[in-house]
């Protein structure tokens, strides 16, 4: 969500800040990756993302809106013909900021902001959707964990009694599980 900027602007006044961000965006689209300060990169990210979204629309009005920000026709053409098709299936998140360390002269935090041009890998759906589609299959699965939940409880009791050997504890746990199963069948 865009928030109004409070405090000092980049480079002095608001007009100069707009020009600096336009130049940074032009360099980003021209070179696909630029190195700048962290503050400038954080301010550039929403501007660049909005311009890429316009480029994905691809109509004349979107091209004119981008030309109002970036004056270079060659960069706008590259944005609409080369970059937009590469990010067509991506819904936002067109840029990546990577920290590089601090600048030698003034110790300013430096970052690399780059366009994310890799194809999107689809996420695997969780198993919740499969259980919702097959509620009949979910019922036997719900009973099985209840029986298995008794076993860890017995193992924790076995851990407290250190006098018994591991073989004796597993035999005792198996006997208790069988006794519980017999009680369930009697009911």
From Swiss-Prot:
Residues in coiled coil: none
InterPro entries in the cross-refs: Ribosomal_bL17, Ribosomal_bL17_CS, Ribosomal_bL17_sf
GO biological process, one term: translation
Keywords: Ribonucleoprotein, Ribosomal protein
One term under GO cellular component: cytosolic large ribosomal subunit
Acidic residues bias: start-end ranges: 145-157
Composition bias, Low complexity: 127-144, 167-176
GO molecular function terms attached to this record: structural constituent of ribosome
Region span, Disordered: 122-187
Pfam families xrefs: Ribosomal_L17
PANTHER family the record matches: LARGE RIBOSOMAL SUBUNIT PROTEIN BL17M, RIBOSOMAL PROTEIN L17
HAMAP family assigned to the protein according to its UniProt record, in alphabetical order: Ribosomal_bL17 (MF_01368)
Quaternary state and interactors: Part of the 50S ribosomal subunit. Contacts protein L32.
Family membership: Belongs to the bacterial ribosomal protein bL17 family.
Protein name per the record: Large ribosomal subunit protein bL17
Annotated organism of origin: Clavibacter sepedonicus (Clavibacter michiganensis subsp. sepedonicus)
